[in-house]
């Protein structure tokens, strides 16, 4: 098996595991980690496709996605902490609206 195909299969597996975590889990922190897993799967696919094409565009875009993901984690974790302090729990199925 070609190494690029293995990278693409791994990236699809990472994305699907992350998607399953977003759909199944109710803990907000686990959903946030699953979202990051999905983004890492996309990044791996971008870098693998970039290796096939022999360009650096995919690597630059993957770096940009990592930067945006870091900001997403900071904002998401801040919201989760605020919800936990306000409501006393962090389960996503029990929080239906942000306003009281």
From Swiss-Prot:
Its main location: membrane. GO terms for molecular function: NADH:ubiquinone reductase (non-electrogenic) activity; quinone binding. Keywords: Cell inner membrane, Cell membrane, Membrane, NAD, Quinone, Translocase, Transmembrane, Transmembrane helix, Transport, Ubiquinone. InterPro entries: NADH_UbQ_OxRdtase_chain4L/K, NUOK/Mnh_C1-like. The chain crosses the membrane at residues 3-23, 28-48, 60-80. It catalyses: a quinone + NADH + 5 H(+)(in) = a quinol + NAD(+) + 4 H(+)(out). Its EC number is 7.1.1.-. It is a multi-pass membrane protein. NDH-1 shuttles electrons from NADH, via FMN and iron-sulfur (Fe-S) centers, to quinones in the respiratory chain. The immediate electron acceptor for the enzyme in this species is believed to be ubiquinone. Couples the redox reaction to proton translocation (for every two electrons transferred, four hydrogen ions are translocated across the cytoplasmic membrane), and thus conserves the redox energy in a proton gradient. NDH-1 is composed of 14 different subunits. Subunits NuoA, H, J, K, L, M, N constitute the membrane sector of the complex. PANTHER family: NADH DEHYDROGENASE SUBUNIT 4L-RELATED, NADH-UBIQUINONE OXIDOREDUCTASE SUBUNIT ND4L. HAMAP family: NDH1_NuoK. Belongs to the complex I subunit 4L family. This is NADH-quinone oxidoreductase subunit K 1. The lineage of its organism: Bacteria, Pseudomonadati, Aquificota, Aquificia, Aquificales. The gene is nuoK1.
């Amino acid at each position: 098996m070609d190494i690029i195909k293995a990278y693409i299969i791994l990236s699809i597996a990472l994305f699907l595991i992350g998607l399953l975590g977003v759909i199944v889990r109710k803990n907000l922190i686990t959903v946030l980690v699953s979202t990051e897993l999905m983004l890492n799967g996309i990044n791996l696919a971008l870098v693998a496709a970039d290796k096939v094409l022999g360009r650096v565009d995919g690597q630059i875009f993957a770096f940009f996605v990592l930067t945006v993901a870091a900001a997403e984690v900071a904002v998401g974790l801040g919201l989760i902490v605020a919800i936990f302090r306000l409501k006393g729990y962090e389960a996503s199925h029990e929080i239906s609206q942000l306003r009281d």
